[in-house]
C-alpha cells in the first residue's frame, strides 16, 4: 500500500467529545487520531454526497446508500447490465427496488471516488470466485 501524505492538524475539542472518541477508539482497537480522521473523512463525504452513509463489515468500511445497498453492489449491477445512459439508471433502480434518484446518488459518488469503488468490486468478485471454487471442490468431494 502506498504511503499517504499527511499533515498535522491541531484543534480544540469538547471534553465530552474527546471522551467518546477515546471510548470508541478503544472499542475499535485503533488510536484516536485515526478514528477522528475517519470520522472527518466520512462526514465530509456524506456532506458532499447526501444519501451516502458508511457501514463497517468484515472487509472494512464501505460507502452505501442510506437504506439501500453498498455503492459497489449498485455499480456492479449497473455496469453489468446491457442498458446504457438513462435506461441503465432506470433498469438498475427497478432491479434493486430503488428510485432513479437513489441510483443517481450512487453514480455521483462513484464519479468522485471511482478507484475506491472499483477496488471494492474487484475484491468482492475475487471473494465470490474463491467461494464458488471452494463449493465446487466440496461438491466434487461429495461425489
Task: List where the protein language model places each region.
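Short alpha-helical "recognition helix" segments of helix-turn-helix
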Residues: 21-24, 91-94
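Short, basic interhelical loop/turn and adjoining N-cap
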Residues: 30-31, 93-105
Amino acid at each position: 500500500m502506498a504511503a499517504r501524505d499527511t499533515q498535522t492538524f491541531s484543534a480544540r475539542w469538547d471534553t465530552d467529545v474527546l471522551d467518546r472518541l477515546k471510548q470508541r477508539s478503544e472499542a475499535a482497537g485503533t488510536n484516536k487520531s485515526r478514528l477522528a480522521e475517519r470520522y472527518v473523512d466520512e462526514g465530509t463525504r456524506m456532506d458532499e454526497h447526501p444519501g451516502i452513509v458508511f457501514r463497517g463489515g468484515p472487509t472494512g468500511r464501505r460507502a452505501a446508500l442510506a437504506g439501500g445497498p453498498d455503492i459497489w453492489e449498485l455499480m456492479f449491477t449497473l455496469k453489468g447490465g446491457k442498458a446504457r445512459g438513462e435506461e441503465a439508471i432506470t433498469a438498475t433502480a427497478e432491479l434493486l427496488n430503488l428510485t432513479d434518484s437513489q441510483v443517481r446518488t450512487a453514480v455521483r459518488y462513484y464519479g468522485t471516488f471511482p478507484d475506491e469503488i472499483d477496488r471494492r468490486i474487484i475484491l468482492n468478485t475475487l471473494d465470490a470466485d474463491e467461494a464458488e471454487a471452494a463449493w465446487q471442490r466440496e461438491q466434487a468431494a461429495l461425489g
